[in-house]
Regions:
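Interdomain hinge and pocket-entrance segments immediately C-terminal to HTH DNA-binding domains
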Residues: 6, 56, 86-105, 119-123, ...
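A short LG(V/I)-centered, amphipathic sequence patch enriched
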Residues: 43-60
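Central regulatory/effector-binding core of bacterial HTH transcription factors
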Residues: 93-156, 224-227
Length: 302
């Protein structure tokens, strides 16, 4: 009897998706030696080579390519088995793993969490804050049940349910004469001082799209990891930055910072809930989207 384990198949799937032992280990949430050891054990049990190692490159063998669809189906069935017990129970009960991007989490969660607790007291919510690419990967691997991010999301295996629109404003140093007469046109030369989040944050790409006709000269000098850091830099006169409306209320209370609008039509992003295109947790995700859409949008923008 071969006796493959679920863990070995999960590691195999991660390595097949990434073709890189380090990235596969990160996706699986284990150390690289642990993943390598389990892959080697899997090859020993199957009595065949699954991956060709050549320096930093990894290539799947013909045997591995033939096995991949079957292993993916097995793992998908296992994930469905793990959640089948929820069927027939009230919606949103038990463990639910939700991801959310950093430019939404601190502003949305304080409003969403009390509502979820009120409606679904048996819900065991597990939160993960990460950039969109990481949330997509975790959802693909079955490590998240759903996530909240900004569209567009181009993965055809995802269902996306729009939640709300979030307009963009500018955060500028208080007293800056370049912004004395708002609203600000997107082509304003003053936006050359635009500061951006580091690579990987969708807000960075959205800022570049909004101010695409202006070259942000400060971009190379500053790559902040959080919106809070960017706002502190703006308050110290180092530049300006794009800020979502849901963050503008709290930011307006900062000293030496001013929030100004763009010219109409104001740019905006659409925030959505996304989950895998299957029926396992579909009803629960629809219920979650309904709760979030039911929030008072004026409260979110406050």
């Amino acid at each position: 009897m071969i006796g493959l384990t679920v863990r070995q198949m999960q590691y195999f799937e991660a390595l097949a998706q990434t073709l890189h032992f380090g990235r596969a280990a990160k996706l699986a949430g284990v150390s690289q030696p642990a993943l390598s050891s389990q892959i080697a054990e899997m090859e020993l049990r199957l009595n065949c080579r699954l991956f060709e190692r050549g320096g930093k490159s990894v290539r799947m063998t013909d045997e591995a390519l033939a096995m991949l669809p079957r292993i993916e189906r097995i793992l998908a069935d296992i994930r469905e088995i793990e959640t089948t017990a929820r069927r027939g129970r009230p919606a949103m009960e038990g463990r639910f793993r939700l991801g959310i991007i950093p430019t939404v989490a601190p502003y949305l969660l304080p409003h969403v969490l009390p509502e979820l607790k009120r409606h679904f007291p048996a819900l065991q919510l597990e939160l993960r804050e990460a950039v969109t690419a990481s949330l997509v990967e975790d959802t693909a691997l079955g490590k998240l049940d759903a996530f909240i991010a900004a569209v567009p999301l181009d993965q055809p295996w995802l269902i996306t349910e729009p939640l709300f629109s979030d307009r963009f404003f500018l955060a500028v140093p208080a007293g800056d004469p370049a912004f004395a007469s708002p609203p600000v046109p997107p082509e304003s030369p003053a936006l050359e001082r635009l500061m951006l989040l580091e690579e990987g944050h969708c807000l960075r790409e959205q800022a570049l799209a909004v101010c695409g006709s202006v070259r942000p000269v400060a971009m190379a000098s500053y790559g902040a990891t959080s919106l809070t850091t960017l706002l502190q830099m703006v308050a110290h006169g180092l530049g300006v930055t794009l800020i979502p409306e849901m963050a503008a209320g709290p930011a307006s209370a900062m000293r030496d910072l001013k929030i100004v609008p763009f010219q109409e039509p104001m740019p905006q992003r659409t925030i959505c809930l996304a989950w895998r295109r299957n029926k396992v947790r579909h009803d629960e995700c629809v219920e979650l989207a309904k709760i979030i859409r039911g929030l008072d949008q004026a409260v979110l923008a406050a």
